[in-house]
């Protein structure tokens, strides 16, 4: 069993999404008796934006397909995912490999893979929030993974930019959710 651990935050040790993905990976590894972990830090070693020349490099796709579980840290920057994460997604959403077009429309080809995504946001963007219309990270990630045949699981830490107290409260709550997800 292999875990692919994806981090996209540029905030290093101060990153809430990195703290959450580390906790998820640690708990899954412990529960599964030390699964192999492949860590791809998209902020430290970003993939170039997709070009025709870059399309031939299938290393990100190969890692994704080989993993049994994928854990993704997705901080929300300017209402969506970081460009580093988008560049990675561009390499795993491949016609004929992770999805196909058929008579009934697109069909996801990725089966039996668990994807856990930790989304961190500076404000509150839930459905009941006045800012809900500005949230494009969760909706994008859910749509992309559904498109390729995966039902992703999410944990959220919201309101991180409001105050230090709110940040601490949100992270504590998210870590409780992580324990439930990783079980």
What are these regions (language model features)?
Residues 128-183:
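Glycine-rich phosphate/pyrophosphate-binding loop and the adjoining helix
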Residues 101-147:
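Short, glycine-/small-residue-rich phosphate/pyrophosphate-handling segment
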Residues 9-11, 122-125, 159-163:
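A short, flexible beta-alpha/helix-coil linker loop
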Residues 42, 120, 157-159:
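Active-site donor-binding loop signature of nucleotide-sugar glycosyltransferases
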Residues 5, 72, 115-119, 154:
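Structural beta-sheet core signal
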């Amino acid at each position: 069993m292999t875990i692919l651990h994806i981090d996209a935050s540029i905030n290093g040790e101060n990153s809430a999404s990195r703290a959450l993905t580390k906790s998820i990976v640690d708990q899954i590894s412990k529960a599964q008796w030390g699964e192999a972990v492949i860590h791809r830090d998209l902020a430290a070693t970003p993939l170039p934006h997709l070009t025709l020349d870059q399309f031939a490099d299938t290393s990100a796709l190969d890692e994704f397909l080989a993993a049994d579980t994928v854990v993704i840290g997705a901080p929300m920057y300017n209402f969506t995912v970081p460009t580093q994460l988008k560049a990675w997604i561009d390499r795993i959403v491949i016609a004929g490999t992770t999805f196909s077009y058929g008579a009934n429309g697109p069909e996801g080809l990725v089966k039996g893979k668990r994807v856990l995504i930790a989304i961190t946001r500076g404000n509150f963007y839930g459905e009941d929030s006045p800012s809900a219309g500005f949230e494009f990270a969760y909706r994008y990630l859910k749509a992309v993974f559904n498109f390729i045949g995966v039902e992703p699981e999410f944990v959220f830490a919201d309101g991180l930019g409001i105050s230090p107290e709110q940040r601490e409260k949100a992270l504590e709550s998210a870590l409780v959710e992580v324990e439930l997800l990783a079980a």
